[in-house]
Curated annotation (Swiss-Prot):
Protein name per its UniProtKB record: Uncharacterized protein ORF413
The organism's taxonomic lineage, starting at the top: Viruses, Adnaviria, Zilligvirae, Taleaviricota, Tokiviricetes
Transmembrane stretches, start-end: 25-47
Organism: Acidianus filamentous virus 2 (isolate Italy/Pozzuoli)
Keywords annotated in UniProt: Host membrane, Membrane, Transmembrane, Transmembrane helix
InterPro entries recorded: ConA-like_dom_sf
Membrane topology: Single-pass membrane protein
Cellular localisation: Host membrane
Annotated Gene Ontology cellular component terms: host cell membrane; membrane
Predominant localisation class: host cell
């Protein structure tokens, strides 16, 4: 579901008066195909703006939780009071969507307008619109919206298609005479990947491989998340000795990723990570180090400070191939605790606590970078339905082989 509301502020007898009206969502049928078909982003970012009959105004934007979803708020002001009859919102999503996402026409001219606030309310179980509506995407880089699915018999990373308000994919189970009682569907947005993510099997577990076991690899995925805490389950089946370079999780960003850092950072074993706007905490787990956890503070300009340094680079942290690991980040007040556990062996791999320089918000974008430089492992996500917020289990009653359509419908109000 997606809908919008426009608030005009006018001056009436030296008093501020607000006029609110629902708007019309337009071009969703143009945005959805762009989300599903974009393979690379533009070379520059166009600032969001509102076009009116009185001229264009640049806007700032923010995102906040609202009911079971989020509201994206675009705000702009006129240099002098203006008379408004129509307006169009251009979010410049994905740096390439240069059409209005919403429009509004008033039955009479509204005089003396000083500012416009345009709220777009989104409740999206796929997470795709949460990732697409804000414009700050790393420029000139790979982009992939995809559906990772499994049914207990097989798994696949599926290309998405779109038609009008529909997003769809086709899942093929080619096994013979096996029951299909469910399909787990997980929508992901990947950017700046060196090698395309893929569906694999590690041991007896279906897995989504983020990077292969080779040098010079990284992959970024991100999502909007309504918690101070973070959990991720992962595994690997092959790699060097010692292993590298693990993951960096940047939490509390106010936007999707805006840049990829590849330079050295004080206290980190490896500085390759994507980050967004706003005050954020980046947690590195790199088993190439004997103390494999570092915690750093970042903002939209880049690195700010090191709160916890990793140590013993090159000595390695013992991990067992094919085991399942849990990376868990919990926050209590300003204390952050990072723990990595081998749940197969029932042992703790690493655990550290650190005091944060600010109390983190209860929502924001989580930006995860998996990376390999000179040493490596095929870092992969497992048990995704247990921890990833944009996961949907669809009950079915079939026997393989089957070709099964998976469809998401986006409604406007």
């Amino acid at each position: 579901m997606i809908y919008g509301e426009v608030t005009l502020t006018i001056i009436d007898n030296d008093k501020k008066v607000k006029i609110r009206k629902k708007n019309t969502i337009v071009n969703l049928s143009a945005l959805l195909p762009l989300i599903t078909s974009t393979t690379s982003t533009a070379g520059s970012i166009i600032t969001p703006y509102i076009q009116t009959n009185a001229g264009n105004i640049p806007v700032t934007y923010s995102v906040q939780p609202y009911e079971s979803g989020y509201v994206f708020i675009f705000t702009g002001s006129f240099s002098q009071p203006s008379n408004i009859i129509s307006a169009f919102l251009y979010p410049s999503s994905l740096s390439t969507f240069q059409q209005p996402i919403a429009s509004i026409v008033y039955s009479r001219e509204i005089t003396g307008v000083t500012s416009i606030e345009w709220a777009i309310y989104v409740d999206d179980a796929t997470g795709l619109l949460y990732n697409a509506l804000l414009p700050n995407i790393i420029t000139s880089t790979n982009f992939l919206s995809a559906l990772y699915a499994d049914d207990g018999n097989t798994n696949a990373l599926l290309t998405l298609g779109a038609y009008q308000h529909y997003v769809y994919a086709y899942f093929s189970d080619a096994t013979i005479s096996k029951a299909i009682n469910y399909i787990n569907a997980h929508y992901f947005t990947f950017i700046d990947y060196t090698t395309s993510p893929s569906a694999i099997t590690i041991g007896n577990n279906f897995a989504l491989q983020l990077v292969p076991a080779s040098t010079g690899q990284h992959t970024v995925f991100y999502y909007l998340w309504n918690s101070q805490n973070f959990t991720m389950q992962f595994s690997f089946s092959s790699g060097s000795s010692p292993l590298a370079d693990g993951f960096v999780v940047c939490m509390y960003a106010t936007t999707p990723p805006i840049a990829l850092n590849t330079s050295s950072v004080t206290g980190m074993t490896n500085g390759t990570l994507a980050y967004g706007e706003g005050n954020q905490i980046c947690v590195e787990f790199d088993p190439y180090s004997s103390q494999p956890i570092s915690v750093t503070q970042w903002n939209g300009s880049g690195y700010v400070s090191t709160l916890l340094s990793s140590s013993g680079a090159g000595t390695g942290t013992s991990m067992t191939a094919n085991d399942i690991f849990v990376l868990e980040i919990t926050v209590s007040g300003t204390t952050m605790t990072v723990t990595v556990t081998d749940v197969t062996a029932n042992k703790t791999i690493a655990s550290q606590s650190v005091t944060l320089p600010f109390t983190p918000p209860s929502y924001g974008y989580a930006i995860i970078t998996a990376r390999n430089e000179n040493d490596y492992a095929n870092w992969s996500l497992v048990n995704i339905v247990d921890w990833y917020p944009y996961s949907i289990q669809i009950p079915t009653s079939y026997v393989s082989p089957q070709l099964l359509p998976i469809t998401a419908i986006f409604n406007t109000d």
